[in-house]
Each structure stands twice: as structure tokens, then as C-alpha cells.
Amino acid sequence: MVKVYAPASSANMSVGFDVLGAAVTPVDGTLLGDVVSVEAADHFRLHNLGRFADKLPPEPRENIVYQCWERFCQALGKTIPVAMTLEKNMPIGSGLGSSACSVVAALVAMNEHCGKPLNDTRLLALMGELEGRISGSIHYDNVAPCFLGGMQLMIEENGIISQQVPGFDEWLWVLAYPGIKVSTAEARAILPAQYRRQDCIAHGRHLAGFIHACYSRQPQLAAALMKDVIAEPYRARLLPGFSQARQAVSEIGALASGISGSGPTLFALCDKPETAQRVADWLSKHYLQNQEGFVHICRLDTAGARVVG
């Protein structure tokens, strides 16, 4: 049997809509991600378990893990009879790359089970394709960091899908999931079809400056450039209490904050553990909406998807 863990990810990071994402892991050792197990069987079977298994589609063929198995078999040109188990530990529609976790874990597990017939680039292309079935368009800003680890910039040129951007060891990512669902497709539909020239210029300046600051090792500058003129002005209305939360975490000392992915998770970036804890405490009291919500203090997950059994 092969068991693969795929970590949560925070896409966009305010500054890089659809082209930037970071894999994250809680500092307390909690596993924030999905696990998929694969073993040989006489015919295909899929079993779901985990905290959020009851939120999955009741029809097995609608489960993204089934679709991953089906697409992987197509890529190999043969049917591979396996029993798969999805441990769904990630809330659906959370802005933490929940579907990417399932897609990445499933495809890596299948590839490991079959002796790695597909290389990383081919696997990543399949991951983007399958993630696109859920979100409505192919994009790699969750699947790439989830699969490869660290902070990833989408390239999509010369056969290169993404490349790693150096992060900062001192950065702590406070992630607050309020417990409500925001559909990725809905969050994309709310965005305008066209943008003003000044917004395009500002977006280009912020993203170019952020990447420069990462490579020139200027964490304060990098954090200051994490501004969103593309999605946040339109998506903030989908998130109860978001504007107040951003103001509060800034006053506490967060370097930057914004919407993780398409929301509703909020991320806040800190460079001191005590600041991160104060931010986490405030968000726990004021941003969470129900018992399904949670707050984690995280660092970059540099390993990405890995075999755990």
C-alpha cells in the first residue's frame, strides 16, 4: 500500500492572482492536508473518511479522486484496479487548496503505486487539468505548491509550469478559516471581465517588486508589496467581517494580510511568534463563524506532497 500526504496551500498571496501560491504546514505539527492511500485490488473501490468526508459528493463518479484515477488510467492507456482511500481532512471551499490536496495526493499515490511512469511535469499538468474541473478553469497556484512545496510562481512557458521562489524563514502564516464555504467558481464569477489600466500597472509593479524582494532578501519590502487590486476589492463582500479583521491584525502587528485563494480563509503574515499568536487569538475570537472554523499558525511547507506510508 502507498499512502501520500498533500499539504494545504494559500494561493494568490494577494500579490499574485492565479500565478503565485505557497504550501503551508502548522508549526505545532498538525497535519493540515489530505491523505490518499492506494493498494492493489481486483476492481476499483473508493472509501472516504476524515473530518470533512460527509461534505464530499455522494455519487462516487463525482468525487475528484475517482476522476484522478480515471484520468491517470487514460494517461497510461490501461485500467489499473486499485482500492483508494481518501482521508478528507480539509474543508471544501475554504481557500486552502482543498481540492488541490485531494488531486495531488491521489495522482502522486497512483504514480508511486505504478512505479512512477509519469514525470513531475506530466503529473503537474494532469493536476492542473483536474483542479480545473472543480474551479472552472485550469490554474496551478494551488496544485504546484501542494505538489512541489514552498512558494511557487507559475511560468507556463518553454515546457516549465512553475518554479520555486525563495521564501523567508522568519515568516509565520496565520490562517483563519471561518467555517463557511465560498465556491471557487462563484468567487471567480464575481470578478470583472476587464480592468482599468492603472490597476494593471499597479498589479504588475506589486508582483515584479515582490519577486525581486524575495530574491534580494528584503522581507519587509516583500510584505509591503503584498497588495491585491485584482480580486480582493470584489471578493471581500463574500467574507463576513473580513475588512474589520484586516484592520485589526494590522494594528496588532501583521506585516500583510489578505484572502487566501478565493476565500473565506484569511491569511496574516507575521515575523515574530508572539505577534502571530496575538493575531491568531484575535481571529479565533472575532473571525470564526462556527464550530467548523479553525486558526493555524504555519510556516512554508518546503517538502510538498510526500509518501507517509
Curated annotation (Swiss-Prot):
Superkingdom of the source species: Bacteria
InterPro entries according to UniProt: GHMP_kinase_C_dom, GHMP_kinase_C_sf, GHMP_kinase_N_dom, GHMP_knse_ATP-bd_CS, Homoserine_kinase, Ribosomal_Su5_D2-typ_SF, Ribsml_uS5_D2-typ_fold_subgr
Enzyme class: transferase
GO molecular function: ATP binding; homoserine kinase activity
Gene Ontology cellular component list: cytoplasm
One BP annotation, GO: threonine biosynthetic process
EC number: 2.7.1.39
Primary residence: cytoplasm
Pathway(s): Amino-acid biosynthesis; L-threonine biosynthesis; L-threonine from L-aspartate: step 4/5
Functional note: Catalyzes the ATP-dependent phosphorylation of L-homoserine to L-homoserine phosphate.
Family affiliation: Belongs to the GHMP kinase family. Homoserine kinase subfamily.
PANTHER family given in the database record: HOMOSERINE KINASE, HOMOSERINE/4-DIPHOSPHOCYTIDYL-2-C-METHYL-D-ERYTHRITOL KINASE
Name of this protein: Homoserine kinase
